[in-house]
Amino acid sequence: MQISEPVLFKGAPGSPYTRKMLAYLRFRHIRYELLIGDQTQHKNLPEPKVQLLPTFFLPDDDNKIQAVVDSTPLIRRFEADFEQRRSIPQDPVMAFLNYLIEDYADERLTKAMFHYRWYYQADIDMAGTILPRWTSIQSPEAELQQ
Protein backbone atom coordinates (compact mmCIF):
# COMPACT_ATOMS: atom_id res chain seq x y z
CA MET A 1 0.00 0.00 0.00
CA GLN A 2 1.31 3.45 -0.90
CA ILE A 3 2.25 5.61 2.08
CA SER A 4 0.67 9.06 2.31
CA GLU A 5 2.18 12.16 3.86
CA PRO A 6 2.63 13.25 6.52
CA VAL A 7 4.14 10.01 7.80
CA LEU A 8 3.11 9.48 11.43
CA PHE A 9 5.57 8.00 13.91
CA LYS A 10 6.39 7.81 17.60
CA GLY A 11 9.91 8.42 18.84
CA ALA A 12 12.09 9.93 21.54
CA PRO A 13 14.44 12.91 21.16
CA GLY A 14 17.52 11.00 22.31
CA SER A 15 16.80 7.70 20.61
CA PRO A 16 19.57 7.09 18.04
CA TYR A 17 17.13 5.33 15.73
CA THR A 18 14.58 8.14 16.00
CA ARG A 19 17.38 10.60 15.12
CA LYS A 20 18.37 8.39 12.18
CA MET A 21 14.84 8.32 10.79
CA LEU A 22 14.33 12.06 11.35
CA ALA A 23 17.52 12.73 9.37
CA TYR A 24 16.38 10.36 6.63
CA LEU A 25 12.90 11.91 6.34
CA ARG A 26 14.35 15.42 6.29
CA PHE A 27 16.91 14.50 3.64
CA ARG A 28 14.23 12.93 1.47
CA HIS A 29 11.84 15.87 2.02
CA ILE A 30 9.16 13.49 3.27
CA ARG A 31 6.66 15.29 5.49
CA TYR A 32 6.18 13.68 8.90
CA GLU A 33 4.49 14.07 12.27
CA LEU A 34 6.59 12.99 15.23
CA LEU A 35 4.73 11.95 18.38
CA ILE A 36 6.80 12.07 21.55
CA GLY A 37 6.04 10.20 24.74
CA ASP A 38 2.41 10.27 25.83
CA GLN A 39 1.19 12.13 22.72
CA THR A 40 0.04 8.78 21.30
CA GLN A 41 -2.37 7.97 24.15
CA HIS A 42 -5.54 9.39 22.61
CA LYS A 43 -4.87 8.67 18.95
CA ASN A 44 -6.18 5.08 18.90
CA LEU A 45 -3.03 3.74 17.24
CA PRO A 46 -2.04 0.07 17.09
CA GLU A 47 0.70 -1.25 19.35
CA PRO A 48 3.83 -2.73 17.79
CA LYS A 49 4.63 -6.41 18.35
CA VAL A 50 7.90 -5.29 19.96
CA GLN A 51 8.09 -1.96 21.82
CA LEU A 52 10.91 -0.27 19.89
CA LEU A 53 11.50 3.31 18.82
CA PRO A 54 10.80 4.73 16.44
CA THR A 55 7.42 3.17 15.68
CA PHE A 56 5.85 4.16 12.36
CA PHE A 57 2.12 3.89 11.72
CA LEU A 58 1.74 2.81 8.10
CA PRO A 59 -0.94 1.18 5.95
CA ASP A 60 -0.67 -2.52 5.15
CA ASP A 61 -1.89 -4.22 1.95
CA ASP A 62 -5.51 -3.97 3.20
CA ASN A 63 -5.06 -0.26 3.99
CA LYS A 64 -5.24 -0.94 7.75
CA ILE A 65 -2.80 1.02 9.89
CA GLN A 66 -0.03 -1.13 11.36
CA ALA A 67 2.71 -0.27 13.86
CA VAL A 68 6.04 -0.88 12.11
CA VAL A 69 9.51 -0.83 13.66
CA ASP A 70 13.11 -1.41 12.44
CA SER A 71 14.69 1.46 10.58
CA THR A 72 16.51 -0.44 7.81
CA PRO A 73 13.40 -2.13 6.32
CA LEU A 74 11.49 1.14 6.79
CA ILE A 75 14.06 2.99 4.70
CA ARG A 76 13.77 0.34 1.98
CA ARG A 77 9.99 0.77 2.00
CA PHE A 78 10.24 4.56 1.80
CA GLU A 79 12.71 4.26 -1.07
CA ALA A 80 10.05 2.33 -2.99
CA ASP A 81 7.15 4.64 -2.08
CA PHE A 82 8.71 8.10 -2.46
CA GLU A 83 10.43 9.31 -5.62
CA GLN A 84 12.25 12.46 -4.49
CA ARG A 85 15.91 12.47 -3.41
CA ARG A 86 16.69 8.78 -3.08
CA SER A 87 19.27 7.87 -0.46
CA ILE A 88 20.29 4.41 -1.67
CA PRO A 89 22.68 4.54 -4.63
CA GLN A 90 21.62 2.94 -7.92
CA ASP A 91 25.04 1.32 -8.41
CA PRO A 92 24.92 -2.18 -6.82
CA VAL A 93 28.41 -1.91 -5.31
CA MET A 94 27.63 1.48 -3.78
CA ALA A 95 24.25 0.20 -2.56
CA PHE A 96 26.00 -2.72 -0.84
CA LEU A 97 28.52 -0.38 0.81
CA ASN A 98 25.63 1.85 1.90
CA TYR A 99 23.90 -1.14 3.50
CA LEU A 100 27.13 -2.34 5.15
CA ILE A 101 27.89 1.05 6.71
CA GLU A 102 24.28 1.47 7.84
CA ASP A 103 24.25 -1.99 9.43
CA TYR A 104 27.54 -1.37 11.23
CA ALA A 105 26.35 2.01 12.50
CA ASP A 106 23.03 0.53 13.67
CA GLU A 107 24.52 -2.46 15.45
CA ARG A 108 27.91 -1.25 16.72
CA LEU A 109 28.12 2.53 17.04
CA THR A 110 25.17 2.66 19.41
CA LYS A 111 27.37 0.83 21.94
CA ALA A 112 29.63 3.89 22.15
CA MET A 113 26.62 6.18 22.44
CA PHE A 114 25.21 4.20 25.37
CA HIS A 115 28.64 3.99 27.00
CA TYR A 116 29.02 7.76 27.02
CA ARG A 117 25.42 8.25 28.10
CA TRP A 118 25.86 6.08 31.21
CA TYR A 119 29.57 5.84 32.12
CA TYR A 120 30.50 9.23 33.60
CA GLN A 121 28.63 10.54 36.64
CA ALA A 122 27.80 13.91 35.06
CA ASP A 123 26.30 12.10 32.06
CA ILE A 124 24.37 9.71 34.32
CA ASP A 125 22.90 12.68 36.20
CA MET A 126 21.98 14.49 32.97
CA ALA A 127 20.38 11.40 31.41
CA GLY A 128 18.50 10.66 34.64
CA THR A 129 17.02 14.16 34.51
CA ILE A 130 16.12 14.16 30.82
CA LEU A 131 15.02 10.58 30.03
CA PRO A 132 11.81 10.52 32.14
CA ARG A 133 10.57 13.59 30.26
CA TRP A 134 10.80 11.80 26.92
CA THR A 135 7.96 9.45 27.74
CA SER A 136 5.87 11.53 30.10
CA ILE A 137 6.10 15.13 28.98
CA GLN A 138 2.85 16.09 30.71
CA SER A 139 3.80 14.72 34.15
CA PRO A 140 4.30 17.10 37.08
CA GLU A 141 7.87 17.68 38.32
CA ALA A 142 7.24 15.86 41.63
CA GLU A 143 6.17 12.70 39.79
CA LEU A 144 9.25 12.80 37.55
CA GLN A 145 11.56 13.06 40.57
CA GLN A 146 10.41 9.66 41.91
Show which residues each predicted segment covers:
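GST-like domain detector, emphasizing the conserved glutathione-binding G-site
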Residues: 1-142
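Alpha-helix-centered segments that form part of catalytic cores
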Residues: 145-146
